[in-house]
């Protein structure tokens, strides 16, 4: 059995948290040979803490062999103590009549505090995944609030967008998702993201040979992927939870255990690749090995792609500018 792993999960009693915790405890994120301690954070109000205790009771009742312990708390310093991994799921949702800039400001307060707590008490090599929206900018805020931690270890979740795009291509091609490789989602986890299959293959054959249809790409594929979250809310009355939790599992598992040479999409701090400003958390194609990721370099960016990448970059720059005064 490998060393015990401590994983902190914020918003632990929420819909995504509920879909996530049982799968972590079953060994789906860190492997079937690693015991886990779940360190669960929720809001300090009575209702949220009662719900969290109920989740803990259910986890106990599963008798997971790999679940070595649990902590439930409303204190980030306790939840993040010695954490090897931190999944920042909880965020302020957008309320009726709330402007996007108001949402950014509310979440900036949360992620400044959580970044500072991670900086204070987490392991120095902690790996952080931000799921709570707006995920890229929240990850940027947490990273900037944790100056003593490795900035490369602050990431945002674009894997849900990646998986959604994969599924759409699978349906279009009548091919299993497992046979499709080298798909990319560029940019922000928002409707401006750019799913890009120019380099993707199915059974080793370039997909653009099978789908050489820019009208389908622009008018069907990209809008379907970018608006999928809204379509699920309309159909279900609630936002994506199980699929978001599944994407978080995929993201962390591949980061920690390796992608075996396959391209995956992660929101990571830019190193200046593709003209994206250094430090901006942006969706890139990466490969992972030994717990570290590398951005896939030197892919050609055509005019069509540049238009979409510039649009998602502009949105991220606007978000970053709106919270810059909070990070001084």
Swiss-Prot record:
Q: Which residues are annotated as active site?
A: 189
Where substrate binds, per the record, is at 94, 100, 133, 164
Q: Identify the InterPro entries for this entry.
A: L-lactate/malate_DH, Lactate/malate_DH_C, Lactate/malate_DH_N, Lactate_DH/Glyco_Ohase_4_C, Malate_DH_type2, NAD(P)-bd_dom_sf
* MF annotations from Gene Ontology: L-malate dehydrogenase (NAD+) activity
Show the catalytic activity: (S)-malate + NAD(+) = oxaloacetate + NADH + H(+)
Query: A single Pfam family, by name?
Result: Ldh_1_N
Residues reported to bind NAD(+): 11-17, 107, 114, 131-133
| Biological processes per GO annotation | malate metabolic process; tricarboxylic acid cycle
Keywords in alphabetical order:
NAD, Oxidoreductase, Tricarboxylic acid cycle
Q: What's the Enzyme Commission number for this chain?
A: 1.1.1.37
Listed SUPFAM superfamilies: LDH C-terminal domain-like (SSF56327), NAD(P)-binding Rossmann-fold domains (SSF51735)
Task: Give the function comment from the record.
Answer: Catalyzes the reversible oxidation of malate to oxaloacetate.
Q: Which family does it belong to?
A: Belongs to the LDH/MDH superfamily. MDH type 2 family.
Quote the protein name from its UniProt record: Malate dehydrogenase
Organism (species): Xylella fastidiosa (strain M12)
């Amino acid at each position: 059995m490998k060393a015990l792993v401590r994983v902190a999960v914020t918003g632990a009693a929420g819909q995504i948290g509920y879909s996530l915790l049982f799968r972590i405890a079953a060994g789906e994120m860190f492997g079937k040979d690693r015991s886990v301690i779940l360190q669960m954070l929720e809001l300090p109000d009575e209702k949220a803490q009662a719900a969290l205790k109920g989740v803990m009771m259910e986890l106990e009742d599963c008798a997971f062999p790999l679940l070595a312990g649990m902590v439930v708390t409303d204190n980030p310093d306790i939840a993040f103590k010695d954490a090897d991994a931190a999944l920042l799921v909880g965020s302020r949702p957008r309320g009726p009549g709330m402007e996007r800039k108001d949402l950014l400001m509310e979440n900036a307060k949360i992620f400044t505090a959580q970044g500072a707590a991670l900086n204070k008490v987490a392991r120095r090599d902690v790996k952080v995944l931000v799921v709570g929206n707006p995920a890229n900018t929240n990850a940027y805020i947490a990273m900037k609030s944790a100056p003593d931690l490795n900035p490369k270890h602050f990431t945002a979740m674009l894997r849900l967008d990646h998986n959604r795009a994969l599924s759409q291509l699978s349906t279009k091609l009548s091919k299993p998702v497992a046979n499709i490789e080298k798909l990319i989602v560029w940019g922000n986890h928002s409707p401006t993201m750019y799913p890009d299959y120019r380099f993707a293959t199915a059974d080793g054959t370039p997909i653009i040979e099978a789908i050489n249809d820019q009208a389908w790409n622009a008018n069907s594929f990209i809008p379907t992927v970018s608006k999928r979250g809204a379509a699920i809310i309309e159909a279900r009355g609630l936002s994506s939870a199980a699929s978001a939790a599944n994407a978080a599992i995929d993201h962390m598992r591949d980061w920690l255990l390796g992608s075996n040479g396959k391209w995956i999409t992660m929101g990571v701090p830019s190193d200046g690749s593709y003209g994206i400003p250094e430090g901006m958390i942006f969706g890139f194609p990466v490969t992972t090995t030994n717990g570290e990721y590398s951005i896939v370099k030197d892919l050609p960016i055509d005019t069509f792609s540049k238009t979409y990448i510039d649009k998602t970059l502009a949105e991220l720059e606007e978000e970053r500018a709106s919270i810059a005064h909070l990070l001084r």
